Amino acid sequence: MSETSEQDARNLAAQHRELQQNAESVNQQLGMVQMSIEDCTRAILTLEELKSASGAINTMIPLGAGALIHANIADVDKIVVSVGAGISVEKTPTEAIETLTQRKEELGKVVERLNGTLTQIGQRLASIESAVGNRPPQ
């Protein structure tokens, strides 16, 4: 193999490794965004159930690390919703559902962009693999 084609092969191998790492990173981001979408979905469903309930609601609230506490929810007229940057605001259940639905839609767009990025990375990986596979033996 000539020095130039050896260097080309090393460059292609390095690009391939970098693209694989990028794909793994994008897949991790995709997983986190999908978990956020699932969180929004669960919150929306819970709010819809709470909205339709009458009287005090007996429930268990997670404290973390698998610990739960029994609680009675007497008032579901005000829901505290995070709006980012550590700021939370009180909203009606309907407003909270609207906010979470919008957030879910925005996250869906992020999923589409990440899937597009994964497709591009896959195409670049395929072209590198094709270039390496089509090289004449030296």
From Swiss-Prot:
It comes from the Archaea. It is found in: Cytoplasm. The keyword Chaperone applies. Molecular chaperone capable of stabilizing a range of proteins. Seems to fulfill an ATP-independent, HSP70-like function in archaeal de novo protein folding. HAMAP family: PfdA. Heterohexamer of two alpha and four beta subunits. This is Prefoldin subunit alpha. It comes from Methanococcoides burtonii (strain DSM 6242 / NBRC 107633 / OCM 468 / ACE-M).
